[in-house]
Design a protein with these regions (language model features):
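Hydrophobic anchor residue at the start of the ABC signature
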Residues: 111
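Catalytic Walker B motif of ABC-type/P-loop ATPase nucleotide-binding domains
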Residues: 122-126
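Conserved ABC ATPase signature
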Residues: 97-101, 105
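The feature captures the beta-strand-to-loop junction immediately N-terminal to the Walker
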Residues: 14-16
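Q-loop/switch helix immediately C-terminal to the Walker
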Residues: 56, 63-82
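Helix-to-loop junction immediately C-terminal to a conserved catalytic motif
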Residues: 28-29
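Conserved ABC transporter NBD signature motif
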Residues: 33-46, 53
Length: 184
């Protein structure tokens, strides 16, 4: 399979569960063994060390499992994290224990942690699956603002076609681990 996501653009990726969407994101992020080639701005993944590649690629899994005990431990510099920007009404969230957060709060925290690393590419696997409509809109706006401000390329996986129409410029459909169609 072959496709291009230009800097500052978002590709929406849909398909049934098990069609290979997450496998594709994990392969691009170099988290699983794969045989393809991926490039960022013309530089092949093979020219980077694994850690340097993963600094350029921000992967947000459908459910983040790697957490420090407190929210604040996820941010080297708390100035990079504005809780209000991510829908937290109380700035004291930085002192909170992660295991006391709801799944939606953890999802927004995972996005904040991801964006604080300033990746050039965002790989978002169902980034709004655990969110209410208000926070879904908030995340869509945050990613759009980040994409526009930093020129990041984004691959956004979702089952919600209307969401993909809102957030992406190009949409692809996966079926049986293959790209089937390109809808504009």
């Amino acid at each position: 399979m072959s496709f291009i996501v230009d800097s500052g653009k978002c590709l929406g990726l849909s398909g049934q569960s098990g069609s290979g969407k997450t496998l594709l994101l994990r392969a691009i992020a170099d988290l699983d063994l794969n045989h393809g080639e991926v490039s960022i701005k013309g530089k092949k993944r093979s020219s980077f060390s694994g850690p340097n590649w993963r600094k350029k690629i921000g992967y947000l899994p459908a459910e983040s499992k790697r957490w420090h005990s407190s929210v604040g431990q996820h941010f080297d510099n708390a100035e990079n994290f504005s809780p209000e920007d991510f829908g937290f009404s109380d700035a004291s969230i930085i002192e909170s224990e992660v295991d006391k957060l709801s799944s939606g709060e953890k999802q927004r925290l995972a996005l904040a942690r991801l964006l604080s690393g300033l990746p050039e590419v965002l790989l978002l696997d169902e980034p709004t699956a655990n969110l209410d409509p208000h926070n879904t809109n908030l995340v869509e706006e945050l990613v759009n603002d980040y994409r526009n401000t930093h020129g990041a390329a984004v691959i956004w996986v979702a089952h919600n076609e209307s969401q993909l129409v809102r957030v992406s410029q190009t949409r692809l459909l996966m079926k049986n681990k293959s790209l089937l169609s390109n809808e504009n």
